Amino acid sequence: RKETACLLEKEVSRELSELGMKSVKFCVNITFDQDESGIAVNGENIKFTKDGFDNVEFLISTNPGEPLKPLAKIVSGGESSRIMLALKSILAKADMIPCMIFDEIDTGIGGRTAQVVGEKLSKVAMNHQVICVTHSPQIASMGDVHYLIKKLVKDGRTYTVVTELNEEERINELSRMLGGVEITENTQIHAREMLNMAKEIKKNHLSMSKDLNAFTTFKKEISI
């Protein structure tokens, strides 16, 4: 576990840097509890459970100079979502959770970083269902399905309406996200380009995944 923890720390730090969190420190803290009736390890009696005798906790510092704190105590929703995305990107195939929800993962980011976030979400979605609430056109363009959420007031009551967008509606919505309220020819062209680029990126992800699976199968056959 300690050897794997060191590898995980490096991988998570690299992923977070790509997600625009270059100053973040990530640490895997492994401790144990003493117990007189426990198992003797290196001259000490250690409490042993069905999960082993290690207590494993993820610690993180999101700003320079701040002490490491338990990941569970991170306040910012956007930071928490990106940290979880970094972990899920690394553990995607080993994690058995069928559905993952990322809320406001675009907080405080834009441009190239938002594009990277969208691409990583797309990779995670190859092994899990991913639901992402976002205001970022870069992230929205990477989705396989796009829903628009609106609030409407009718007869003095507020309703939330969720609508699945078709291709043309999606272009218009991405155009609005890119340019504000007004949809122009330029924003529509940009929106189409983003969707076409997203299709190519996802096609490459699928091709790379198939190549990796084929290589893994080949290695197993050679080992046999």
Give, region by region, the residue ranges found by the protein language model.
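Charged, surface-exposed helical/loop "interaction arms" that form contiguous linear patches used
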Residues: R1-S37, V41-G43
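Phosphate-binding glycine-rich loops of NTP-binding sites
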Residues: E15-E18, E79-A92, E119, A125, ...
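Flexible glycine-/small-residue-rich
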Residues: V28-F32, I60-T62, L87-S89, K151, ...
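Short pre-catalytic strand/loop immediately N-terminal to key active-site residues, enriched for Gly-Thr
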Residues: E44-K47, L68-V75
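C-terminal lobe/lid and adjacent interdomain/linker elements of RecA-like ASCE P-loop ATPase modules
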Residues: V56, R112-I224
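GG-anchored amphipathic helix commonly corresponding to the ABC/SMC/Rad50 NBD signature/C-loop
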Residues: E57-F58, T62-P64, G78-M100
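Conserved D-loop-proximal element of ABC-family nucleotide-binding domains
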Residues: K69, A94-D95, T107-Q115
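Walker B catalytic acidic pair
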Residues: D103-E104
